[in-house]
Amino acid sequence: MDLPKAYDPKSVEPKWAEKWAKNPFVANPKSGKPPFVIFMPPPNVTGSLHMGHALDNSLQDALIRYKRMRGFEAVWLPGTDHAGIATQVVVERLLLKEGKTRHDLGREKFLERVWQWKEESGGTILKQLKRLGASADWSREAFTMDEKRSRAVRYAFSRYYHEGLAYRAPRLVNWCPRCETTLSDLEVETEPTPGKLYTLRYEVEGGGFIAIATVRPETVFADQAIAVHPEDERYRHLIGKRARIPLTEVWIPILADPAVEKDFGTGALKVTPAHDPLDYEIGERHGLEPVSVINLEGRMEGERVPEALRGLDRFEARRKAVELFREAGHLVKEEDYTIALATCSRCGTPIEYAIFPQWWLRMKPLAEEVLKGLRRGDIAFVPERWKKVNIDWLENVKDWNISRQLWWGHQIPAWYCEDCQAVNVPKPERYLEDPTSCEACGSPRLKRDEDVFDTWFSSALWPLSTLGWPEETEDLKAFYPGDVLVTGYDILFLWVSRMEVSGYHFMGERPFKTVLLHGLVLDEKGQKMSKSKGNVIDPLEMVERYGADALRFALTYLATGGQDIRLDLRWLEMARNFANKLYNAARFVLLSREGFQAKEDTPTLADRFMRSRLSQGVEEITALYEALDLAQAAREVYELVWSEFCDWYLEAAKPALKAGNAHTLRTLEEVLAVLLKLLHPMMPFLTSELYQALTGKEELALEAWPEPGGRDEEAERAFEALKQAVTAVRALKAEAGLPPAQEVRVYLEGETAPVGENLEVFRFLARADLLPERPAKALVKAMPRVTARMPLEGLLDVEEWRRRQEKRLKELLALAERSQRKLASPGFREKAPKEVVEAEEARLRENLEQAERIREALSQIG
């Protein structure tokens, strides 16, 4: 046997990771096997592995390895995303260290630098996934800006444009002054932030004033109206009149609109269509022309803006404007107020709103195609509740702003004629050809749109483009649609719904059959991990400390029902201990083979029990894999390995091995081989190493998945009675304060025949022998099918034992009384954190239960 005494993941995992990376599991579209396809959510090319990636890919790899062993042509398509904003920001920061900006380089040179960075650093995360054991088809690795994916993007846009679904129009958009690009609503994060609410008064035409409340006084100069609720009696007499914008000579109408909240502020709303989404909608209804006073750099500009504010940053302008309003008598009051601050999800800068032309995708007609499919059950969701969430979003979807003012990304294939201003987009049949003259007027003076597509535009094509679409490739014919999409619920709208749109529109069917949505990985307190909080758990550090198998197993074990995961390092310790337990069990089996001399070949009760339980386990665990309930599958295999195999069967097998029973050795080997197969999808490194040592076969990943055998219910029932007898004896020893190895004598009642028929096994496991008669005084432990009685005479000083128990009983009752007083205090329950109250309640229950057990033991001894 060549297994070292102790398991060290560092000596095992890297060699297998290297082997799988060098010899990837390449899919064959012509194999004739049923396909099973997973599209890997492409991580950002800028990224390093975080816990979300580790969870996501652990689940995907478990499914792909399971299906590969089930005989499917298992295809896991990997790749990375060009991550427009994120990548551009990374390279801009590198330039900043050189004292340069992207504008100093110009677009062409800047893009050369980005590609250079991508080639040097962009493969980091895929290398890290390989270290985690990801058995993807690395020969099919894709990048959202490589040649094939770029063709897909151009073709999709050409189709959308010529079908009237892609159009260019000026609209109010989210704008990041730092990243200098528009953002979709899904790329904007809103956080409650301490701020101020300012009440300002406007002079009303004909005399008097009207007061409004705002958190953005610097935008007053862009007001185009004051709106009040039509049913607000306070202001009904002012509707139709005009008010003057403070510090200006601009008069604006006072109008009625039902969108106004009567109970907010003064009940009157300043309407600033160019700088607020609600105001933009009100302006659209009332025909108000938007006026902007903040430019794309976030600075004040425009004729309406007082000279003292022009050119100032918007936040500096806010402070200065408040001073001017105060001095002029327009500031009624200033109060603390929690504002919903909208920020760029990439850089954290507070966003601005701006109106200028953008490319949009009409989502309503596209969503209808998806909704029909979802309503007829085309796509299953796990957990099922997310299906309704998906449908609700699609039913209320708005047009998608698909253009971004970046340099890194897919440049939009649209050209503008400098003579007649016509838009030129290549037709689908010539989608790769750049136009040389205007289709409308024939002019050769064409200028290409400088914007790029939103990163999610290319990501939305991922299930198609990874298979070679729009070409009719063998992969596309064989592997579309995919089977399972595994991803976090946080990108359901950003990505999953948009892939559904692409699939139904371009392929006429669903892009995948099932969507498995998992939760976020949080810290042990349930907080989102972030560098600023200092609570980030680095998966690579965990791999170094516990092993990749332990990390994978812990995350899978915790991924229940799509809920967020609170990751405590104790779970990683649990998984590492599990790996060690399995390793030691395998070493025992391998050691048992050395020098073994067969003297008999008879199935023991323990052999029959283990084979029967294994058959049941195979059936249940297979069903859980099929149901995509990987967390429960992990728990079932953990119980089967740790409890049934290691704790019970291995121990029960030792007397038979000592007696030279070949059937028992064979059972050990066969059961271990099956357990390694069941666990392989979740713990591929250790199981591969042990399977090779056990069987001499090179690649467990290519072995067949086990099939359930027959059940032996008689053996299971008999062995359960034996287990209960052993458990009862062990419990009695613990109650009496005796060491587990202490030899004792007990009297058994109930279903005792299995003990009598397997006396050697009972004696070995329980370290006990049987009394022929029931003792008068004894400690008693009742189990469902067996009751054990153990007299204390001859084992210990009964009176001393009694004194110790009575003393402990008093201590427990005192502790319980203290807990009861604390829990009865209204102040404690109201002020203490929920987890503190729950811990105190648990302490009370435990102390009362222990006290009751001691009372019972004392009454038994008499």
UniProtKB/Swiss-Prot annotation:
Extent of motif 'KMSKS' region: 528-532
Keywords linked to the UniProt accession: Aminoacyl-tRNA synthetase, ATP-binding, Coiled coil, Cytoplasm, Ligase, Metal-binding, Nucleotide-binding, Protein biosynthesis, Zinc
Gene Ontology MF, one: ATP binding
A Gene Ontology biological process term: valyl-tRNA aminoacylation
Enzyme class: ligase
Primary subcellular site in the record, as a coarse category: cytoplasm
Co-factor(s): Zn(2+)
Highest taxon in the source lineage: Bacteria
GO CC field: cytosol
Family (UniProt): Belongs to the class-I aminoacyl-tRNA synthetase family. ValS type 1 subfamily.
HAMAP family: Val_tRNA_synth_type1
Protein name, UniProt field: Valine--tRNA ligase
Organism: Thermus thermophilus (strain ATCC BAA-163 / DSM 7039 / HB27)
Lineage, opening ranks: Bacteria, Thermotogati, Deinococcota, Deinococci, Thermales
Gene name of the record: valS
